[in-house]
């Protein structure tokens, strides 16, 4: 299979692109081209009958090659006797330049909460981003306590909520995860954003999403400069939808900041190679365009842009917002 790559453009070129009257058709064609790229990989562990109870859906597989493999807490190696003990529906996903920057996971179910916390401790994860409502059924099981000083217990893992901070658009909690068998504790920073639409109606609140990404990135930088941290864990009710959008915007913004360039299709392709079924729908891809577009308008990266292009773009922001909104009013999807 040949190597697939997409064109990288400057910020100026990206801004010019978003001003085109045929932008929606361009987005659809670009997404169609993405979907035609054959991805390498197998889904053998996802398909095992023994693991079916650990999957929320049969429609969205988990790649073998990038999956998180649960290990024995005592030996540090995968279990030999019980193949289901190594499995969790979660994959490592690279950042723009950082390998395994994220773990993209399905939202915990009642029977997978213990595995979820085992993964958090095993991979030294200190940040969790939840992009879903909690209903203990369809969307997400309550794997942490949304009340100060309360505890949740899953097997040998005790999760105590130490602090809850209500930000403008999300809830930030500080948790203490303890492995009671080995007397090991780890502090967790939990970001809970519930304003994602359950279906693909518009609008998605771009400033809110960007605010969330900023705070998550800020916390990660703080941890990396002090105690260190493993991957950022992200999950959503749709298994892959909003998780894929979050990672796409995060990585694209990293490229914008570091290199003053962007390649949205290449960013999506790289994520799809690690997390099966990510950005499957062109509407998801359009959302990525919209949010990135607004991010470039609001970040300090404008100092690197052509001022004439920037001014022209500013003049048309209202029209573009109306355009995107109109397209989403016409196309609403309930298929994930």
From Swiss-Prot:
Gene3D superfamilies: Protein tyrosine phosphatase superfamily
GO molecular function: protein tyrosine phosphatase activity
Disulphide bonds in the chain: none
A Pfam family reported for this protein in Swiss-Prot or TrEMBL: Y_phosphatase
Highest rank taxon of the organism: Viruses
Family: Belongs to the protein-tyrosine phosphatase family.
The name this protein goes by in its record: Tyrosine phosphatase-like protein H1
């Amino acid at each position: 299979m040949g190597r697939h790559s997409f064109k990288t453009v400057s910020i100026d070129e990206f801004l010019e692109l978003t001003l085109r009257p045929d932008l929606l058709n361009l987005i659809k064609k670009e997404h169609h081209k993405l979907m035609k790229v054959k991805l390498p990989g197998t889904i053998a562990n996802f398909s095992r009958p023994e693991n079916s109870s650990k999957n929320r859906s049969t429609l969205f597989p988990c790649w073998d090659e990038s999956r998180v493999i649960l290990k024995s807490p005592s030996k540090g190696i995968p279990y030999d006797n019980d193949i289901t003990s190594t499995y969790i529906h979660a994959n490592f996903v690279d950042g723009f330049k950082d390998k395994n920057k994220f773990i993209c996971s399905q939202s915990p179910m009642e029977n997978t909460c213990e595995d979820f916390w085992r993964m958090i401790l095993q991979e030294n994860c200190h940040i969790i981003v939840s992009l879903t409502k909690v209903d203990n059924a369809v969307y997400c099981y309550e794997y942490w306590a949304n009340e100060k000083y309360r505890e949740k217990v899953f097997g040998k893992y005790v999760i105590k909520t130490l602090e809850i901070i209500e930000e403008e658009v999300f809830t930030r909690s500080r948790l203490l995860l303890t492995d009671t068998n080995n007397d090991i504790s780890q502090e967790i920073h939990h970001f809970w954003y519930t304003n994602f639409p359950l279906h693909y109606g518009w609008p998605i609140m771009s400033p809110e999403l960007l605010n969330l990404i900023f705070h998550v990135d800020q916390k990660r930088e703080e941890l990396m400069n002090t105690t260190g941290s493993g991957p950022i864990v992200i999950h959503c009710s749709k298994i892959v939808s909003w998780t894929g959008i979050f990672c796409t915007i995060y990585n694209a913004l990293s490229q914008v900041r570091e290199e003053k360039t962007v390649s949205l299709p290449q960013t999506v392709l790289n994520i799809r190679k690690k997390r099966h079924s990510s950005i499957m729908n062109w509407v998801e891809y359009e959302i990525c365009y919209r949010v990135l577009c607004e991010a470039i308008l609001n970040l300090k990266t404008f100092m690197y842009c052509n001022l004439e292009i920037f001014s022209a773009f500013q003049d048309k922001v209202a029209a573009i917002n109306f355009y995107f909104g109109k397209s989403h009013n016409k196309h609403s999807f309930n298929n994930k």
